[in-house]
């Protein structure tokens, strides 16, 4: 069995805000369109893993990616499509495959897919939990040079200070308004 890298991919504003009420607060800002393109270019062709709340916000699976959904309330044994896909090693990008944990998603991808990495795409709580639990091998983080906080009930912030991630790459776009940082475990 091969080992794959689980790579978190997320964005934050200059204050560390990564989400509000299960949404991206910058999604309608024209200055952040670069990041959506970066996300698509980076994840296309690879398996993606998301939490249940992120799954609910999608209308359909993301194209050209095998889509896994972490739902701890759903039994893997009840998922006929994933059992069939594991047996035949044939997954498609028109379905969501439900798993009970990030660990299970990693195991299935390592056993049944020809991939060397998979991306954990959100939501914010799922990504932060993976960082805290040391479940990510790498992290790609976009930082916008702007604050997006508005009066909200449910902001989620990121703090990497207490992790063992080290920066491996840094690139700026849009006249320094968007910064892409790549991290790996130290």
Give, region by region, the residue ranges found by the protein language model.
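Enzymes that bind and transform nitrogen-containing heteroaromatic metabolites
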Residues: 2-186
